Amino acid sequence: MALNDWLDWGDWKGIRGEEMAAFCASLIWWIAALVVLSQCIRMVSSRQTGPILNDKGATIVKEQKRNMFLRLPIILTAVAVLGLCAVVRVADVGHQFGRQLSSYTATTTTSSNDAQFTVAMDSDVGADLIPNIFDPEAVDPQSVCPGYTASNVQETSHGFTADLDLAGKACNVYGNEIEALKLVVEYQAADRLHVEILPRHIGKDNYTWFILPEGLIPKPQNDGKTQSAGSESDLEFKWANAPTFGFNVTRKSTGDVLFTTVGTKLVFEDQFFEFASPLPKNYNLYGLGEVIHGFRLNRNLTRTIYAADIGDPIDGNIYGSHPIYLDTRYYKADSDSDELIYVAEPTDKTASYKSFTHGVFMRNAHGQEILLRESNITWRALGGTIDLYFYAGPTADSVITSYQKSAVGLPAMQQYWTLGFHQCRWGYTSWDSLQEVIDDFAKFEIPLETIWADIDYMNQYRDFENDKNSWTYEDGEKFLDKLHKNGQHFVPIVDSAIYSPNPDKKDDAYPTYDRGLSSDAFVLNPDGSLYVGAVWPGYTVFPDWVGAVLGKSKTFAWWKTELETWFKKVAFDGIWIDMSEVASFCVGSCGSKNLTQNPAHVPFQLPGEPGNEDYSYPEGFEKTNATEAASISALSSSAEAAKSTAVNDAETTSTTTSYLRTTPTPGVRNVNHPPYVIDHIHGDLAVHAVSPNATHHGGSEEYDFHNLFGHQILNATYHALLSVFPGKRPFIIGRSTFAGSGKWAGHWGGDNYSLWAYMFFSIPQALSFSIFGFPMFGVDTCGFAGNADMELCARWMQLSAFFPFYRNHNAIAGIPQEPYRWSAVADASKKAMAIRYALLPYMYTAFYRAHTLGDTVMKALVWEFADEPWLADADRQFLLGPAVLVTPCLVQGATTVDGVFPGVGKGTVWYDWYNQSAITGVTSGQNVTIDAPLGHIPVYLRGGYVIPTQEPGKTMEQSRANRGALGCA
């Protein structure tokens, strides 16, 4: 808590625990100091400095000495108190503003205190690789590969097929060239065109090198309504050998070429393919995730699609794989011919524009790289087929709807209670600590729907087992019974790796592992032995979801059994799936020969452990909290100096790097180090992940299915929960996702940071996941890593109140950030929550439309107001449903915010939520400065809509019992 907050008497109601102890220490210090000072003054003033003039002089001297000796214990005691309080204050520099590191770090030791061995720190170090796009020695496939020529065209009922044959000598630049390909073109629906290029000859041994099995990812099918090839479609496919094979996809209504490979060469090898298309000047592309980035994609970037366990780097590949983009183009009608003409710079806000949006989806699960440059797009992948789906639109909403209905499935419908507020942190140490948080929410009258538990609850970080001391099943039953009677809910985390017990320790038995082993439920090494990596519990094995579909593994049945068995002990209400990229903290099967060392400590310091404290704070903290910032800076500098010394001691004198480069071998794939190196955030594909050569039951390799682990664990969890909760909709939040995961689960944005920049990035991330088919999306409000401060947390709690999934969560090394920790945050939260809870019937309706129609819940302004090109990159505002406009303050220290009121030039009227007044005097595209003092978030209602509301309560159960109303704007 900041010093100025301590002086705010209104904030005293939020002080608890160590915060009060810190304050009391300060108070006692000053009292003790005054005692010492007063006693010293009395001693000095009572001493006789002149000669003794009477016969009682000896008695007076004795009395003075006696008084001095009487005061001496008082002084010494006061000095001791001074020292003790000083120690408390020094040890608690951060406690002025709520730091509680010691209490949360304790969970690290309670869960890992049996560790005998630490996995080597260098065990997660891979080969030195340089991404192809940065490699000066890299070969450009377009300059050396021959391309293909098309022949043997065969008409089909909805399109045609053709043979593609290599047009010259194989280049074998990043794999072994496939000489004979097949082209399949199919008009699947009036708004959807399918283009697939695959090898003509595929055997059982290399089937999964190229074919993505429909048992894992369903393939969009012909809708049965299209009568003849292309006659009803606004899309047209044409091809030519000019001189090598290329194709065009054109929009008939505008004559615009949406995608063309003509003039470039198709490259197709067993570990690499490439095709390219020009893009119009100043193009507007969206999607291609998962990545932390602005909503509209820059015109000079590379998008890598490869699931990675990493803490939200900007512009790096992270957890999910979503190879789809939207392309929006703006046109003006020619005054003479009414012909639509593309406009590269639609800046005239008085002009009338018409937009068209199309979508492109690549059904491919391999590692991919999409190069966006100033005037073209190049698509590369490490395997699979070119399996493209073009969506005609012509609006973003219609593309998203068609994509969901045809390719990935309609989003999961959520239970009503899931729309309430969720509280979590890594560092809640017991059932009692959860109850304390719940009680504090009630004390400060802040709504709380769901309390979550991170890995703290686990017995030595093992799935489906509770800690035997602080999280007993008996105490949990009492806690959950009370929680559920109060209409509240509980969601625990479940990680994706399974502890492998120490064979030399009889007391290390783990029934979950034993049942999985008997079900052939775990991923293997190429030699058939168990693949053993390392995650939180130590050395671990990994569920084989692919083997359950393509082999004889009983992984799904085993997973169902584990959830059902655990539910009988812990009556959870939903499941949080984490680490599902899938993460492993060592390269390769590092635990195969080390199981007798289990349970082992991970090869790095856990957050909050000595030497790994977190002293980071939001941008601007040093201005608004100068005293605390200075103390933190000193501690941080000391810690960094220690780290720097350790690093310098370990450094070698080498100043050059020798990169590993591999070349293709005929008939053999190098899956661990493919010849083409994608720009992967971890470099080596085996770093922080299961190695690409890990083998699934049935013989397929992880290389071909890495991006699907998170998708399939959500599939398994969803269907298991249908059994756990008969007749109820499963509630699941997952980290790693793939195209289609949204039909089973929601998603949170992962391990973000307590920074203003990340609060902003949460908006484009949410809008991107609307494209991907995930209406249930939110982020770690107030930030996961680092330390939030009052202003950031207040603004973020306001912003997230209008996200579909609303949860506050942070890491074990950070200060507590529950909204009641600061009075200003509590007030801002309650005000924003009151609006959210009032709008819950409206939000629930939006979810129903998403689930049944493929609509979006959180919307970009440009989707609703498609013909206003100045909204093309608007990502600091958004719409909740079609009728609620949110304009959050995203800048530290600001008390106003700039925003636009879309549609005002065409008759749209906006009304202030707070006073119901209409916004007037605003022109189309005008940036308006809006008052946004701390505690206020501007919210507006769109005219012409009827909005269902209800009186807000502290829980969904209370809210639904309150009276409802209809608001007409």
For the regions a protein language model found, what residue spans apply to each?
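Short, low-complexity, Lys/Arg-enriched N-terminal segments of secretory-pathway carbohydrate enzymes
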Residues: 1-16, 21-27, 31-67
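Hydrophobic or amphipathic alpha-helical targeting/insertion segments
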Residues: 230-268
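A low-complexity, Ser/Thr/Gly/Pro-enriched, surface-exposed linker/loop concept
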Residues: 129-164, 177-230
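N-terminal signal peptide
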Residues: 2, 38-42, 80-137, 142
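Transmembrane alpha-helices of multi-pass eukaryotic membrane proteins
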Residues: 16-28, 70-77, 708, 792
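Extracellular/lumenal N-termini and interhelical loops of multi-pass eukaryotic membrane proteins
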Residues: 1-8, 97, 101, 109-110, ...
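Catalytic-domain carbohydrate-binding cleft regions of carbohydrate-active enzymes
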Residues: 117-159, 255-937, 941-942, 950, ...
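C-terminal low-complexity, glycine/proline- and small-hydrophobic-enriched intrinsically disordered tails
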Residues: 941-969
